[in-house]
Amino acid sequence: MSLIQRLISSDKYSLKCPYSMTPKGICIHNTANDATASNEISYMQSNASSTSFHIAVDDNEAIQGLPLNRNAWHAGDGEIGEGNRYYIGVEICYSKSGGEKFLKAEDNAASLIADIL
């Protein structure tokens, strides 16, 4: 699966990804909604919340919104926790309704993660 880069502007690093990092692994989440990867990335990049993640994957595409050498606020373990500081955050789309789109998004995420590792 190819990864589309649509990286956040560096002026938002202080809010969304303030620390450089060397990733130790990948932390996978479900979005708990039915938005596309493009919509997930757009919302994450444009809102005023620090909550962030690196990649969103849906049934058609995978989009990277943050540099993989910067942290993201996705794991809920604060500023010093390893989840946020050392793991790439991947969001799988369409988890609210499930079904074929969600299953394809899971397959796409597995393929992408295998490529990253």
Pin down the residues of each PLM region.
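Active-site-adjacent loop/helix surface patches within enzyme catalytic domains
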Residues: 1-117
